[in-house]
Amino acid sequence: MSKDMLVNEGIRAREVRLIGANGDQIGVKSKAEALDMARNVNLDLVCVAPNAKPPVCRIMDYGKYRYEQQKKDKEARKKQKTINVKEVRLSPTIEDHDFNTKLRNARKFLSKGDKVKAAIRFRGRAITHSEIGRNVLERLAKECEDIAIVEAKPKMEGRSMFLVLAPKTDK
């Protein structure tokens, strides 16, 4: 809902389609008549569909309505999760212990719900043996296949090769 809804005198239309406080349709009334009806029950006249012909207005407690909307928006923001991409750097000639350390880090990131970008940087003549780097990345993907899916297969970009792993979702 928009934060600046038309309320009471802010409504510019001469005639409005009126909905009562309990949700029943009252019909097309003049703005003055609708405002009087709202004031008689100590509520506000709020335009809920200003683009309709005639605009649809509802009799409600605007302060309470705005508070409820803010609460809903806050809950929705709470439920949203930001996905971070963590990077793990490897080398094509990585030793087993170093590989296991990088693997442990990647698994930790994946278990927290983050994506992992595994990168291998080729230095000097190592670029001619890019298949060694590809094997290292595929090994990492295979070791993580129980908790992750491969989002982007190993691919070369300049002197680096990348692989992106995303955590498996429970759906």
UniProtKB/Swiss-Prot annotation:
GO biological processes: ribosome disassembly
Similarity-based family: Belongs to the IF-3 family.
Major localization listed first in the record, in broad terms: cytoplasm
Compartment list: Cytoplasm
Record GO cellular component, one term: cytosol
The protein's assembly and partners: Monomer.
Name of the gene this protein is made from: infC
InterPro entries named among the record's database cross-references: T_IF-3_C_sf, T_IF-3_N_sf, Translation_initiation_fac3_CS, Translation_initiation_fac_3, Translation_initiation_fac_3_C, Translation_initiation_fac_3_N
Keyword annotations of the record: Cytoplasm, Initiation factor, Protein biosynthesis
Protein name (database record): Translation initiation factor IF-3
PANTHER family given in the database record: TRANSLATION INITIATION FACTOR IF-3 (PTHR10938), TRANSLATION INITIATION FACTOR IF-3, MITOCHONDRIAL (PTHR10938:SF0)
